[in-house]
Amino acid sequence: MAKVTLVSWTNKPLQVIHAMTQNMMGNIITDLDSIKEEDAIQTIRELQKTSLGGPLEYVDFTFQVEGVPRALTHQMVRTRVGAVYSQESLRFCAKTGEQFKYDIGKSVKTEEQLKVYHEAMKNAQQAYENLLEAGVETQDARGVLPINILTNIGVKYNLKTLMGIAEVRLCTQSQPHWTDIITQMKEEITNKVHPIFGELLVMYCDRHNKCGYESIYDRKCPKQAKFQ
């Protein structure tokens, strides 16, 4: 299971959002300590009623995400607006011996399936280590590594961007890895920063009161009946 740790966030995030929102009203606030928490929370709640979410972009959260498959991080880094990434590089980090760890999907269940899966991983590891021993550079030998090898990545999202990610990745349509990671991010923010921010990280249907996956290509969800 992946591990998510919130390591840094914007100082006085509630007050920053309130002050930047007041800017739009012509009210300049330079002393963040003068802002009452209840006023800032009310401002954040009001921002949920409008499409003007700019003030939410002033608040950043930085996480360390450990033990996730590279297949997942390939998806993570597609989000570029309001996001920064710093990932373990296979050009420099050799995945030999105990460093060669990989993910096993939930549908790989039977003894025969697991046997085939582990054998494939064993062969990939052996080929990788043989290439390194033969003098092939790490950045070239990595080509034989499986896409589900575990990696670590540092990520920073602004609040508005993270809210958009949560809408999609907390949904039942999303793969379990994503749901786990965003759930942990939500818990970290709730416990370390303020519960109001955790409340903002919800599924699309919970925010918009309609399903965002109704095409013939989407899987069915138990919650869809609520919006039909």
Name every feature range the model reports, one short phrase each.
Residues 1-228:
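Family-specific signature for flavin-dependent thymidylate synthase
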